[in-house]
Every structure is written in C-alpha cells, then in structure tokens.
Amino acid sequence: ATAQAPAERRAALEARGITVLTCGDGPQVDLTLAMRQLGEREIGSILLEGGGKLSGAMLERRLLDKLVLMFAPKIIGGGQAAPMNITFEGFAKMDEAITLDRLKVEQFGPDVCLTGYPVFKS
C-alpha cells in the first residue's frame, strides 16, 4: 500500500491479522522500497502475479532474479490494449536487451511455461 491507501481498507486488513506495509507516498507502490522492506523482514522470495505493466516495472528496476512466464496459445490481437506478459519502455539497441539464462521450457496441456534467470547488461 501507499500512504494514500484508504485508511478503512488498511484497518480491515489489519483486523484480519494481515501486515500492511507502506511503500511510498504517491499513488503507486514504490517497488524498490517494497522489496527492501520485505528483505528486512527476511522474506527472500515472492510470487508476483499481475499484468505486464507490473512485471515490466519489476524487471526494469532489476528487482526480479527469476521469471516464470506462462503462455496460452491464444491470439487475440487488439494492439496496445492486448494483454502482454511484460510491458516497459524497452531498450534502444538489441545488445542491451535482457536475456534469460538457464532456460527451461515445459508444456502443461496447451499452455507453455518458460522459466529463466534474467541477465542484465551493464
């Protein structure tokens, strides 16, 4: 949550025994601060489920050290509105691109799972 999160929503979660971390003052969570706070609590692994924007923001900030990407064989089109696994500004040159090391590919029914460890340039 951020400092702007509704107090009643935070209180409802805390009443259920959930620890709510404040990670920034703005409208969006400061992801670097969130990961730092989790590390301080000795939480070394998280399951990040979200859209391409969240995944892209985490990857762009180099906050991910392992990726598990699921692909369903459905082509829906839609241009920019179409959901993507990872969305962020990107790189000017191909040799700056993030690559994946120790790549593993699995198939679960019609879906494909790609697991790898990001290698960041520079």
Language-model features, listed with the residues they occupy:
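Enzymes that bind and transform nitrogen-containing heteroaromatic metabolites
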Residues: 1-122
